């Protein structure tokens, strides 16, 4: 750690600001990896003129890149062509913890938030790789063969993670 409060998340090789609540900060690479690999939903934060726009997506993760399946057109694609800098949030566990005291309720969770740049690679080999990762993540255990016209109708977005922080609450 440097004196500025930064640390390097070594596996991702990302420089990340320390959190205010260090007792809730996740710095363990294995925990961050678990969140990235096991969660089902990634929420993408995009900019729509001067407003925030958030969209939940299915995804897969490999080597600092989040792969996202998408149609060629739609609001998400329109906004990304205007500004390909995005933020994202992924949570793995969440649970409401009740209390007999109204303000004593809390939540137990693990999450990561980050920023990155989205690119589109329309090369059929790149599309197949991204789609294979997504299909395997969600349980496909058969041989994956895609029809050319199916690949032509879809897009694989690649979100290159540039910064990430992890936060948890509750006893893990």
Question: Predicted regions span which residues?
Answer:
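A generic structural signal for nonpolar/aromatic side chains embedded in well-ordered alpha-helices
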Residues: 35-36, 80, 134
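Short Pro/Gly-enriched beta-strand edge/turn motifs at strand-loop
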Residues: 38-41, 140-142
């Amino acid at each position: 750690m440097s004196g500025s409060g930064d640390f390097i998340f070594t596996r991702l090789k990302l420089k990340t600001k320390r959190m205010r609540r260090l007792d809730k900060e996740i710095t363990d690479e294995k925990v961050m990896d678990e969140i990235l690999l096991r969660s089902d939903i990634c929420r993408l934060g995009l900019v729509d003129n001067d407003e925030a726009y958030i969209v939940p997506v299915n995804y897969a993760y490999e080597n600092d890149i989040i792969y996202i399946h998408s149609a060629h057109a739609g609001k998400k694609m329109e906004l990304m062509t205007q500004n390909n800098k995005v933020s994202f949030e992924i949570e793995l566990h969440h649970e409401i913890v009740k209390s007999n005291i109204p303000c004593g309720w809390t939540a137990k969770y693990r999450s990561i938030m980050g920023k990155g740049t989205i690119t589109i690679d329309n090369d059929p080999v790149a599309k197949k790789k991204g789609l294979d990762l997504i299909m395997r993540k969600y349980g496909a255990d058969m041989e994956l063969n895609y029809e050319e016209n199916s690949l032509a109708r879809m897009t694989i977005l690649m979100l290159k993670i540039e910064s990430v922080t992890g936060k948890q609450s509750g006893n893990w």
